[in-house]
Amino acid sequence: MSRWPEVAAQLDRMVNQWYETPEIKRMLTVPLTPTRLAFRHLHMTFFGNNRRDCWAAVACTAPLDVKRAIWEHEKDELIYDPRMGKAHVTEEDLGNHKESDLIPGARAAVYAWLYCAREKPWLEGLACSHILERRNNDRIVKGGTLTQRLVKRQELELGIQRKDQDIGTQVHLIADVDHSALLDEVFTRYVIDDFAAQQVLRGAEESLAIERCFHGAVATAMAELD
């Protein structure tokens, strides 16, 4: 019998608690300016690029059916998303920037995520990546996701209407139900005992802690600009 329903419920609690941490509150309260927004956008571009690395790394050691689910999951982000008219991260998005341009806290988080994807058991690594999408699912997060809250703040503080904001931000305003369903099927099949359940919970907890470091570092640096 699958343990996934109870594990999923625990992940949902973890995700909502994540929004109450000091680092995420800092990101959600630092005053926005065009300069600060551009700084965050650069770091989120590399965040997206790191997601592509991590999903691929997990696929390397995952069973064949899980590789298929990851491949299906990644087609929009890596190759072409019709909602954006392009992949989620392109060479043009990265431009001449390198990971070494990121602030140290963000660079450390990027390396930590990649370490988890490469070195942890595949199920734990899968949970590391999955939880970052789960915490942006407005069907789970109470009070609006990080993306939704920042979009609203751009409207209020900078007068930038939703339709005029970055297309990648607009795409992530709505939970990707199809992607979630793909991975729900995987977790339902594989989370069948306490050992597997603990792997998923451990991977999710690790990743949420890493993301706190990422956003906390970026928010602190944003506050020092201007």
What are these regions (language model features)?
Residues 1-226:
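Non-heme di-metal
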